[in-house]
């Protein structure tokens, strides 16, 4: 990563999905020393309950996961932490689901990808007892999607009243207006009106003031 950071002309580096255990205090410090690194970290969680994680054969605990997130937050001022969560894994009780929800609330993510467990023939999970009914999975998924929406809006609010550096990527028409839309370094979408800004273009870095929400997912 440090070698990639030294490539001339490269303005942004964004990491893909990471194992939580990779993010140690020392690793977070080294990453924070790279100005071109986008502070967007996708740390796959799967469940916020240690008992469920054990059945999933995940090699970390919620405590270790939380330490990784805290390491990032100590080194970056406003890191975007995103994750994946599976609901309805075999044996997931109401109590275990409650633990997951509480843990997600404790961490506070920018975005969460919520999946309902689906059986796959030949897997160890497919042979497990206490398969969760589809209706229960759907309800649990809905509960976490609501939480995800509220946390995501709260994360985006950080930018309102501030200036943001945005990498413009595409033109879109929203409510009859043309906009250039791109991402901040922590992967928040921001739009800039195309009219009156003829100098704007694809792959251009601009610094713009952010006043509020254009849509639920895009700031302006």
Q: Can you say where each PLM-predicted feature lies in the sequence?
A:
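Proteins enriched for Cys/Gly/acidic motifs involved in redox and nucleic-acid/cofactor modification
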Residues: 41, 63-74, 97-98, 102-106, ...
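Extended hydrophobic-aromatic, low-complexity segments
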Residues: 39-41, 53-54, 74-83, 95-97, ...
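Conserved, mostly hydrophobic/aromatic
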Residues: 15, 43, 84, 104, ...
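Short beta-alpha junctions and helix-cap segments that line functional grooves
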Residues: 27-28, 100, 194
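Conserved SAM/AdoMet-binding glycine-rich loop
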Residues: 1-94, 105
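Short, hinge-like loop/turn segments at secondary-structure boundaries
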Residues: 31-33, 100, 129-132
């Amino acid at each position: 990563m440090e070698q990639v950071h030294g490539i001339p002309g490269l303005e942004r580096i964004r990491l893909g999905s990471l194992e939580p255990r990779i993010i140690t205090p020392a690793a977070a410090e080294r990453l924070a020393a790279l100005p071109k690194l986008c502070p967007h970290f996708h740390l796959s969680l799967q469940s916020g309950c240690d008992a469920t994680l054990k059945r999933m054969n995940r090699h970390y605990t919620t405590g270790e996961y939380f330490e990784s997130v805290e390491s990032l937050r100590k080194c970056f001022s406003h890191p975007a932490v995103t994750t994946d969560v599976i609901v309805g894994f075999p044996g997931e009780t109401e109590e275990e689901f409650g633990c997951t929800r509480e843990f997600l609330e404790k961490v506070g993510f920018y975005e969460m990808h919520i999946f309902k467990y689906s059986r796959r023939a030949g897997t160890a999970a497919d042979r497990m007892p206490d398969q969760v009914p589809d209706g229960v999975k759907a309800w649990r998924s809905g509960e976490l999607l609501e939480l995800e929406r509220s946390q995501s809006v709260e994360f985006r609010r950080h930018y309102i009243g501030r200036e943001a550096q945005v990498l413009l990527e595409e033109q879109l028409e929203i409510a009859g207006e043309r906009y250039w839309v791109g991402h901040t370094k922590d992967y928040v979408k921001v739009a800039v009106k195309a009219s009156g800004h003829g100098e704007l273009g694809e792959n251009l870095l601009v610094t713009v003031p952010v006043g509020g929400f254009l849509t639920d997912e895009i700031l302006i």
